[in-house]
Amino acid sequence: MIRKMTQANITDYNKSCDGFTIIGRIVPRYEDGIWSYTEEIFKEHYNKQYELDDIDDSYIEDEDKAVYFYYEEDRCIGQIRLNTNWNGFGLIEEIYVAKGSRNKGIGTALLNQAEEWAKQNQLIGLMLETQDVNLLACRFYAKHSFVIGAVDTMLYSKFPSAHEKAVFWYHKF
């Protein structure tokens, strides 16, 4: 069951954030105005966890923002954080599904909720940013009709993850 974040359930924020497994990366290519990519599978897989963001009340009060939780019984096992971007797209700031609950349609349900929210807000589509090394996420977005719109090789320059590329995915309605 999907529920919008309220003051009553705000403490469930980040409960489903278990990190993710890196099994490889996409290798993007831009040619004749079209993005494509191949996959490179790593010999050794590893787990990755980013520092988690705090949440503020504006995601409850501001109509241009929203957080939705996915519950199994009373346990929060997924979340998606949305914002209205300056370019008319709904920005998926983050989407998480707890490790033990992945590959069960929860991510798809959260994306469907995001699309419904974006359409209610008269946005032209959804967008998000992920890393080239988050191959499993890239596969998920491609499966759900997202396409690469840009790749940024400098975005993470300041961080230990400087070797990663930021991949911007778009789904126009």
Predicted feature descriptions by range:
Residues 118-131:
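Conserved GNAT acetyl-CoA-binding A-motif
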Residues 131-138, 144-147, 154-173:
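C-terminal "cap" of GNAT-fold acetyltransferases
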Residues 7-8, 15-89, 93, 98-99, ...:
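Acetyl-CoA-dependent GNAT
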Residues 1-2:
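Extreme N-terminal starter segment of soluble prokaryotic enzymes
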Residues 96, 127-129, 170:
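Short aromatic/hydrophobic contact patches that present stacked aromatics
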Residues 97, 103-120, 139-143:
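Conserved acetyl-CoA-binding loop-helix of GNAT-fold acetyltransferases
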